[in-house]
Amino acid sequence: LLPNPSHLEAVSPVAAGKARARLQSLDPSGYLSWSGSGGQVVPGSCPVLAVQVHGDASFAAQGVIMETLALSKLPGFGVGGSVHLVVNNQIGFTTPARIGRSSPYVSDVMKMISAPVIHVNGDDPEV
């Protein structure tokens, strides 16, 4: 568990970096057992998983998310995937959603790396 400073989403690249460091510490020779060509970590093949929790407004509005996603496909930066839980808590209430982003969902930024996205209704967990 990593502490998040007052600057929203600043911990996102730190979490990815910590996962990457853990991968490297498990296999100092270059973690060849779960890397593909060019040193890119193959998704689903490594023993480390970064789990990150985000608020809706900060996930779509903070550029650090897009920067972290862009780095995830580079050799030397990939961690083989991470799980991002985006809570639609509407804490960023000072900006209405219709003018706070250019797409219907805050998770649409994940399309830049073709990551799968699952939308669920948190108000009715039994569904």
Where are these regions (language model features)?
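Glycine-rich ThDP/TPP pyrophosphate-binding loop and its adjacent helix/strand module
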Residues: L2-V127
